[in-house]
Amino acid sequence: MKEAVFESSAPAASSGEASWRRYAVAVSSVLLGIIFLVSGGWKVLDPFKIGEVLEQAKVPAGFGPIGASVLGTLEVFTAFLLFTPKYRKLGGLLGSALMIFFIGWVAYFYNDLVGKDCGCFPIIKRAVGPGFFVSDGVMLLFGLIAAAWGPPLRRLRAPALALLVLAILAGGNFAFGAVQRRNVEMPYPVAVEGKPTDLRTGKVFLFFYDPMCSHCDAASKYLSTLSWKDARIIAIPTNDPQFAKDFLRDTKLKADTSLDVAKLRGKFPFVNPPYGVALVDGKVQESFGQAQFDAPSPKADLVKLGFVQ
């Protein structure tokens, strides 16, 4: 009789364990999927803005927007896999790989990134520090649970097709954004030294800066050492305009000042200064994010554009 009881309880225990695992996989997959959907969607929809944030997180200058688009596509794809029960194992594997990559990147550049906003999510500010690794460790745990206990993957055709569609959509959005940014034209008129000015002719270099920013200070000092040709430099303080003259005097940058920051920043959006825009006859030739103001950059690009010797 006891043997019969033991035999009947074994399948019940096994069934209970399987049910518990399915529940753990479902909860972990949904939570991690939401995180990746929000984070990835943000990157895909605005790769140029997020690209600046990535470059500030030590991604090589110029590769931020592409990196944002690629990472965003992979994150949204991972979310799709995690939301689809039969693909949760693959979603867990890819999600875990992404989390390990993020944790490893921040750990490697920790001394440079500590205290800065990681730029992981829209609206939510999350500073790099010990807490960053704790929260990302929890996300990694979610991915490992889905990878370990998710149902076996049988076919890859549907996931491959989904990835292809997402890549096409992300690529199209990236191309549209690039064309849109390139086709922006200088507004008219712009107040320069307090007077309405037409900056739609000739070579113009817009230099956005914060007078209290050490990186802006270094960038301005470096720009002042370049041999400028016939380009006109317009310096635009993003904060504390009362210090504009002192800033230019201290950094020895020969530039005219414009306080039309709202008008110009509306046309040429960016995250944090320093930021530069090279224009010829009012049309954008190239823009320079914060990460591109580390000497000897952006001299080479300005030479190619004919702005400096």
Say what each PLM segment does.
Residues 83-90, 149-159:
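Membrane-interface helix-boundary motifs at transmembrane edges
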Residues 100-149:
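Membrane-embedded alpha-helical segments of integral membrane proteins
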Residues 153-180:
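Internal/C-terminal transmembrane anchor helices
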Residues 269-309:
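Non-catalytic, surface beta->alpha helical segment in thiol-disulfide oxidoreductase systems
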